[in-house]
Amino acid sequence: MNYRIYSVALALSLLTACGDKPTPLPQPTPTPTPTPAPTPTPEPTPPAYKDYEGYTLIFNQGLASVLTSQPDGVGVASSLSLLDREAKTLLPVFSNKATPLNKEYDGQGYLCEGTLSEAGDYLVYMAKYDFTDDSEHASRLLLFDRRTMRLTKNLRITQPDGDEWVRHSFTFDDGTTYLSFDKKHFYRLNPETGKMTALTGIFGYPTGAASWQDKGYFFVRYESAAFVFDKGSTAARKVPIALSGAQIKEIFRMGAQVILRDTANRYYLFDLATGKVLAVFTLSEPIGRSVTIDPATHRIYYSGGTPNLNGAEAKERSVYTATIDTSRPTSEVQGLTSQLLYTIAGRTEADNRQGFKMQVGYHPDLKALMVSYLDQGRSGPLLHDLTKLLLLQLPTTPSESVKELRTFDLHYASDVSLLSVIRPRPTK
């Protein structure tokens, strides 16, 4: 009996103890940490431009007519237009007719072929042919103020000791111009007096010329080196470039840098300011008529062709691209695989000239490629030359393709040989 009472009492005490234990408070649910929204990549700030900086130069060198074995007149006159910074509007600078910027000048309508380049505050047009006087062979130098696009110097040039046209040239920022004529004659031209001084230390048939800041270069046939002139000098010094056993045979001008091709179909990325080779490479598809470069990435874009014929059919109408690695030693020849980027529609019997004379240029502000080509058939309603200019948006990922942004028709343009964006003057 006592045991039974004790058991009941023990059970009641345990129940009381358990009932007195406090009920645990509910724990607060942790607040999830919000995932921060991704910060959008800021749009690149356009450079602070002034005057015509940021505009694109579109230079049509024109074409001489040939009656027998030598040029005897202007077939298509040279011209220069500007494309505005948004790549929407064309502005003519000079042509065979009066323009808002340059109405009349000596030689107008009688000039064709040659080169256009930048030199300090000048735009330099060296016209190979000046047909204002049929009694002698002459060329002409036109210097434009690149801040206003107005013509400031206009000099007719004849060879002092012969009867040849200017073949290649380069100009320094003071307007001093170095000239090569067809048959191994080289001179320095003073634009203020018109006086020409013979150059020394250079010989051979010229194949190209270029300059940047205070250095100018001539390239001659059968040479593995470049002939260099410092600003103001009349004596050349040689800078070796090509690898042993090869000679430089072709030059592609791209502003501060050029690409040189040697007789073994190797290419050299050459810096004009330093006089140094930055890279040596080969391409699975050779460069045809023109090439341009993105200086930030050293990616090149070029028209296709063949090593010897400088263009053939579909390849001549195509744009290829490849990236040069400038961190590798120049003693190593890089074997680059070219990628097909864009091809103009196939020609037919009616438009068999479509795609000829392709020129390419890179627009660093729009990250776009400019491509021009002759857009005229053998027969049709047009009685003059027509060149098509395309603005192509470059892909940003491997899965994207080139997008055509807009097109322009360049009437009376037979041979566009320069598409280049005017950059602010470099500071030393």
Predicted regions: what is each one?
Residues 53-55, 62, 119-121, 174-176, ...:
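Short coil/turn segments that connect the beta-strands within blades of beta-propeller domains
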Residues 48, 103-116, 161-171, 201-215, ...:
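Repeated scaffold domains used in trafficking and secretory/extracellular systems
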Residues 14-17:
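C-terminal motif of bacterial Sec signal peptides marking the signal peptidase cleavage site
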Residues 85-88, 145-149, 190-194, 230-234, ...:
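Short loop/turn segments that connect beta-strands within beta-propeller blades
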Residues 63-66, 70-75, 129-134, 184-185, ...:
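Short glycine/acidic-enriched loop and turn motifs that connect beta-strands
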Residues 89-105, 150-160, 195-201, 235-242, ...:
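A short beta-strand motif characteristic of beta-propeller blades
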Residues 41-99:
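An edge-strand/N-cap motif at the start of beta-rich repeat modules
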